[in-house]
């Protein structure tokens, strides 16, 4: 993963690796959910939905990054839907497909899944700062 592409560091970096990225088209990444993650507690046994959406936004940023000086910033989340859960031991797969690219804004459809089980979907907008 190109760590220069995201300003996030532990504990707010929610992707462990980028598996595919084509600027202007799509990106794919993953997060390995562990019992050691700070958000897993005795009462919180799954990755919170808001953090799944953040992981999707971090994945989406890679569709607009063209060089090490580019920075992707979350600008919008619409139609966010929780469809399942990601618990310790799961690999959360994250994908983002670009639907529009306009004046520095990248919009698209994001999906999170564990295996074949969907976890979340959302329409996400990212602003790319150069």
Curated annotation (Swiss-Prot):
It holds the Pfam family FabA. It comes from the Bacteria. InterPro entries: FabA_FabZ, HotDog_dom_sf. Signal peptide: none annotated. PANTHER family: (3R)-HYDROXYMYRISTOYL-[ACYL CARRIER PROTEIN] DEHYDRATASE, 3-HYDROXYACYL-[ACYL-CARRIER-PROTEIN] DEHYDRATASE. Belongs to the thioester dehydratase family. FabZ subfamily. This is Uncharacterized protein YcsD. It comes from Bacillus subtilis (strain 168).
